Amino acid sequence: PIYYQPASIVLAQAKAMGYAPTFFGVDGMDGILTMEGFDPSLAEGLMLLTPFSATVPETQSFVEAYTAANDGVTPNQFAADAYDGVYIVKEALEKAGCTADMSSADICEALVAQMTQISYSGLTGKDMTWNAEGQVSKAPTAYVIKDGEYVLPEA
């Protein structure tokens, strides 16, 4: 995947060269609009898949708390993934019966075994599960950047 920092360079170079295709990316590009020094107009029409939206009702409590604690910055999927990650690990620790007196190796072993057994619903997905390789099952949503905002694509 390409993340938003290198993607910003690609978009700037494309504009400088007069190259104007429809760019498509994934969740690694979420955050490009708030990157310091980036001209958001360069991302106009960019399509991306991301598991998080700061504009849907289900995330508003998190968005308001995050924005208040971070000088008005709106969270992107990286912030939401981190938030979910803490609670996913907490759930796995509890279900595995981990305690503070366990060795780190024993905790890791218990977590690996437990991760394929849990299902978690959070900011970035509903009923998320993990396979033995650690891959998560969650459905992203398609967005288009229009006028500096993430919007659902028109049918």
Listing of model-derived features with the role each one plays in the protein:
Residues 1-155:
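Extracytosolic ligand-binding ectodomains
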